[in-house]
Amino acid sequence: MAERKGSISGLTDDEAQEFHKFWVQGFVGFTAVAVVAHFLVWVWRPWL
């Protein structure tokens, strides 16, 4: 078998860091929207 060079994903370190930065920003944005949505629903109809 041929040896693999570099990372498993095939990305360079800089590309991987850039991808990670955008992935984290997207995750934080999604989580913020979910928290706001849950808060608004809880204000409308408290479940506790």
UniProtKB/Swiss-Prot annotation:
Q: What is its main location?
A: membrane
Task: Give the UniProt subcellular location, in the record's own words.
Answer: Cell inner membrane
Q: Which residues lie on this side of the membrane: Periplasmic?
A: 45-48
Q: Which GO terms describe its biological process?
A: photosynthesis, light reaction
Which GO terms fall under molecular function for this chain's record?
A: bacteriochlorophyll binding; electron transporter, transferring electrons within the cyclic electron transport pathway of photosynthesis activity; metal ion binding
The terms describing its cellular component in GO are: plasma membrane; plasma membrane light-harvesting complex
Could you list this entry's UniProt keywords, alphabetically sorted.
Answer: Antenna complex, Bacteriochlorophyll, Cell inner membrane, Cell membrane, Chlorophyll, Chromophore, Light-harvesting polypeptide, Magnesium, Membrane, Metal-binding, Transmembrane, Transmembrane helix
- Bilayer-spanning residue ranges: 22-44
Sorted alphabetically, which PROSITE patterns does this protein's record hold?
Answer: ANTENNA_COMP_BETA (PS00969)
The record's section on Pfam families has: LHC (PF00556)
Q: Where does a bacteriochlorophyll bind?
A: 20, 38
Give the family this protein belongs to, as stated in its UniProt record.
Belongs to the antenna complex beta subunit family.
What does this chain do?
Antenna complexes are light-harvesting systems, which transfer the excitation energy to the reaction centers.
Q: How does it assemble?
A: An alpha/beta heterodimer. The core complex is formed by different alpha and beta chains, binding bacteriochlorophyll molecules, and arranged most probably in tetrameric structures disposed around the reaction center. The non-pigmented gamma chains may constitute additional components.
Q: What name appears for this protein in its UniProt entry?
A: Light-harvesting protein B-870 beta chain
Q: What is the lineage of its organism?
A: Bacteria, Pseudomonadati, Pseudomonadota, Betaproteobacteria, Burkholderiales
